[in-house]
Amino acid sequence: FAIQPMSKGQFQIDVVSLFPSDTWNDGKSVFRKDIVQNLKEFSPSFIRFPGGCIVHGVNEETMYHWKKTLGPIENRPGQWSKWAPYYRTDGIGYHEFYELCEYVGADAMYVMPTGMICSGWVKQSPQWNFRHIDVDLDAYIQDALDAIEYAIGDTTTKWGAERAKNGHPAPFPLKYIEIGNEDFGPVYWERYEKIYQALSAKYPDLIYIANSVIRVVGRENDDKRKDIPNFVNPKNVKVFDEHYYNSIEWACEQHYRFDNYKRGVADLFIGELGINGKYPYNLLATGAIRMSIERNGDLNPLFAERPVMRHWDFLEHRIFLPMLINGVDSSVKTSFFYLAKMFRDNTFDVCLDAAIKDIEGLQNIFVTMGYDTASKQYILKLINLQDKKVTLQPEVSGFKRPVKAHKTSLVLVPGKENTP
């Protein structure tokens, strides 16, 4: 690629964006074929967008404003991001997000701003009631209504017509609206109630998701949902998003976390999970929590894999391994991809009792088992966080004689994070 000037002079170039000519959807999309193919192989049930801290930013200017991400990319202003050195170009805008959902067969989860900024950028009071900026909440509510109308509104509506103008007359697969990201406290719940009432009145069939405080409050195994009745009518909180960032040791201790969660209240959503520590133990430790989630299927749990992908050039200071690492001309599936896919491809809807026979010196071995009524298969999952091979004797209920089994193994080796 070259730009050949016709005469001497100074040139200023903006919005330089190069794509292969054969992108997904016969060259009509902004997504490379290899990246979309990897996502299709994973087969997500939903995609959460625009994600986390991009939603609330550090002030109103840096919040996610979806209307500014429509239209030709050269007209999109982009925005500074707290995740330096990233600067958002918004090349994947609100419209492209829904197109990606359609390409991979996923439902859409849009995370809307509530006018509350990142809690790390506001002053804290003794009551954990962060002093957030004053905003016109009605404007944020109207903006969210416009966003929903753009996604699923009839083409006779203002924003439904705009969607059609941008090449998509049919509605997009919007299913979830998350009200804020990591917003919490009395101010949040006051705003949540107003937003929920306004949105659900017009769009009652969408599923609305509330936020929780990011840290663990009280005892480590406390149910984060227990304080909801102190702030809002619990009937208006259908799904509750819990985020966790902690150590390997903490993750191992959470293997039974959700067993004691109260039933009959908000459904469980783990929108973000990040375990710090040495590879591969940090990655395997996420499995201990995942087992607790799938063992408690009556909580109707949702789980979002994150981070989904990163560019090769921005991996140096990463903490958490993404599922995909993308370069200029390739997309690599990492160990995280394969671990997550093993869980995704082996789900069950009936939980069964399973344990590891007590062996002296055996620690950090995790097990769960269930029955999948669709495939009529029993599924046994084992995770070994020790740095050596071990011989295990799982104890499972309901089997009177030996049975044939198919084994799938994922071996993670220290120092080889990209490919297992």
Regions found by a protein language model. Name each.
Residues 116-119, 265-376:
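Aromatic/acidic polysaccharide-binding cleft in carbohydrate-active enzymes
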Residues 363-403:
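Carbohydrate-binding surface patches
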Residues 400-420:
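Acidic, Ser/Thr/Pro-rich beta/coil linker or hinge segments at domain junctions
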Residues 55-92, 121-146, 153-178:
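Aromatic- and acidic-residue-enriched carbohydrate-binding clefts of CAZyme catalytic domains
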Residues 43, 101, 147, 177, ...:
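Conserved, mostly hydrophobic/aromatic
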